[in-house]
């Protein structure tokens, strides 16, 4: 049995297909969703979503925060930004992570430290998505 997964970002629908299972990063940790999951509204952290398609292949996308609504075998995920891991080059993601860590190590002041921390988190998420983790 399967359920519908829709990922929507400001630039359009990023994903819209049936899935057997998803694993996503909420503000309180990772959760798994299967068919007939109880209704749920949750905030999403910067992190990956793993989608097991009907052919048992796993797809990983980088999500940059938002929220998810699970109801009646439909998972609607609305995020500020999303990127399919298959479209992310691992080498570029690794370089971005190294640059973000360098920025984090030299950041001065609360605002810069918070921005640097978020940059590291985004870069780590993109790298994980590129590696289908």
From Swiss-Prot:
CDD domains: F1-ATPase_delta. F-type ATPases have 2 components, CF(1) - the catalytic core - and CF(0) - the membrane proton channel. CF(1) has five subunits: alpha(3), beta(3), gamma(1), delta(1), epsilon(1). CF(0) has three main subunits: a, b and c. SUPFAM superfamilies: Epsilon subunit of F1F0-ATP synthase N-terminal domain. Keywords: ATP synthesis, CF(1), Chloroplast, Hydrogen ion transport, Ion transport, Membrane, Plastid, Thylakoid, Transport. Produces ATP from ADP in the presence of a proton gradient across the membrane. It is found in: Plastid, Chloroplast thylakoid membrane. GO terms for molecular function: ATP binding; proton-transporting ATP synthase activity, rotational mechanism. HAMAP family: ATP_synth_epsil_bac. This is ATP synthase epsilon chain, chloroplastic. Its main location: plastid. It is a peripheral membrane protein. It comes from the Eukaryota. One of its GO terms (cellular component) is proton-transporting ATP synthase complex. The keyword Ribonucleoprotein does not apply. Belongs to the ATPase epsilon chain family.
């Amino acid at each position: 049995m399967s359920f519908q997964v829709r990922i929507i970002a400001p630039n359009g629908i990023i994903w819209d297909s049936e899935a057997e299972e998803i694993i996503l990063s909420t503000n309180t940790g990772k959760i798994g969703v299967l068919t007939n999951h109880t209704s749920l509204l949750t905030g999403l952290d910067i992190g990956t979503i793993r989608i097991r398609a009907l052919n048992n292949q796993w797809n990983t996308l980088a999500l940059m925060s938002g929220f998810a609504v699970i109801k009646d075998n439909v998972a609607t995920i609305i995020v500020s930004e999303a990127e399919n891991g298959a479209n992310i080059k691992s080498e570029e993601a690794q370089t971005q992570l190294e640059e973000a860590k360098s920025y984090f190590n030299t950041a001065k002041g609360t605002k810069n430290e918070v921005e640097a921390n978020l940059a590291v988190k985004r870069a780590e998420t993109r790298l994980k998505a590129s590696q289908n983790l």
